Design a protein with these regions (language model features):
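Metal-dependent catalytic neighborhoods of phosphoester/phosphodiester hydrolases
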Residues: 56, 93-100, 242-247
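Active-site metal-binding motif and surrounding structural segment of the metallo-beta-lactamase
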Residues: 60-106
C-alpha cells in the first residue's frame, strides 16, 4: 500500500485542522492519493484534484495531476479499476474523472446528501461542478453506493463511517503485506484525522459535524489497526518522513 503525494500546501492554519490549536501555528498539508492492489484490481483511496480553479486558489507546491503522480508506481490512469471516495470535498473527488475505467465507491448517504443543491450549498468545500460530475458518472453506471458502516467493498478493503468530517465521510481498513512478510491492517483515515497530532493527542478535527463522533472514530481506528503507526492521517507531510521509502513523494506503508 502506497501513499502518493501530488501537491503540498506550504502554510495552512493549524487551528482549522486540530481543535484548540494555537491560532499562530501553521502546518504544511500533503495532498495525497493512496494506491493499493487487491484481488487483481488497482484501487485508489481518494482521487485528488486537478482543475485550474483549485490550483489558482491554493497555489500548491510541486503539483502534478493525480493521474500523472501514480505513474511513479508504474500505473497508467486506465489501469485504475476502483476509487474509494472518502468524502466529496473538492480535493478528494475532483480527480475522479481522470481515471476513465474506474468504478467510484462512496457512501450512499454522502452521495444523496451532497448531489442535491440543498446539501451541497451547506458546505463550502463541496464544489458544485464536482457534484455534477459525480452524478454524471453515476448515470454512466460507474458509481457504486455503499449502504453504510463496516462494508467490505473489495476483498481486503472495508469502509467505516462515523468520523463526521462530512455528512457520511468514511475511512478504510486495508489488509496488506507489511515489512518482514507479515500481514496486517492499515487504516486510511482520510480527513477524519488530518494530522498525526489528531490521533496521537486524541484531538478532534476542527472541521467536523460531530466532535464526539469524530473522537469515537479515532478510537475505533486505534482498535482496527494492527499497530498505531499504521493509522495514516489524511494530510500530514510527516507520513513521508515516517515511511521514507521509496521516496520522491511516494511512501510505502508497511
Amino acid at each position: 500500500m502506497y501513499a502518493v503525494r501530488f501537491a503540498t500546501a506550504a502554510s495552512y492554519p493549524t487551528r482549522f485542522l486540530v481543535a484548540g490549536a494555537d491560532s499562530a501555528r501553521r502546518s504544511q498539508l500533503a495532498f495525497t492519493v493512496w494506491v493499493m492492489e487487491a484481488q487483481g484490481r488497482t484501487v485508489l483511496m481518494d482521487a485528488g484534484f486537478y482543475r485550474q480553479k483549485f490550483i489558482d486558489r491554493w497555489n500548491p507546491v510541486g503539483f502534478s495531476k493525480p493521474s500523472d503522480a501514480v505513474t511513479a508506481l508504474g500505473f497508467k490512469p486506465e489501469d485504475v479499476t476502483d476509487i474509494v471516495i472518502s468524502h466529496i470535498h473538492w480535493d478528494h473527488l475532483d480527480g475522479a474523472d481522470l481515471f476513465p475505467r474506474a468504478r467510484i465507491w462512496l457512501q450512499r448517504d454522502e452521495y444523496e446528501h451532497y448531489t442535491n443543491d440543498s446539501g451541497a450549498v451547506l458546505d463550502r468545500a463541496i464544489d458544485l461542478d464536482d457534484a455534477k460530475m459525480l452524478a454524471g458518472l453515476r448515470r454512466a453506471g460507474r458509481v457504486r453506493l455503499i449502504p453504510g458502516d463496516s462494508s467490505e467493498i473489495i476483498p481486503g478493503i472495508t469502509v467505516f463511517t462515523g468520523g463526521k468530517h462530512t455528512f457520511a465521510s468514511e475511512f478504510a481498513t486495508v489488509r496488506a503485506n507489511l515489512a518482514g512478510g507479515r500481514q496486517g491492517t492499515i487504516v486510511l483515515s482520510s480527513d477524519n484525522a488530518y494530522l498525526y497530532e489528531n490521533l496521537e493527542q486524541h484531538r478532534p478535527i476542527t472541521q467536523s459535524l460531530d466532535t464526539l463522533s469524530n473522537l469515537r472514530a479515532q478510537a475505533r481506528m486505534m482498535r482496527l489497526a494492527s499497530d498505531p503507526r499504521l493509522i495514516v492521517p489524511g494530510h500530514d507531510v510527516a507520513v513521508f518522513e515516517r515511511f521514507p521509502k521509496p521516496g520522491n513523494g511516494v511512501a510505502h506503508i508497511e
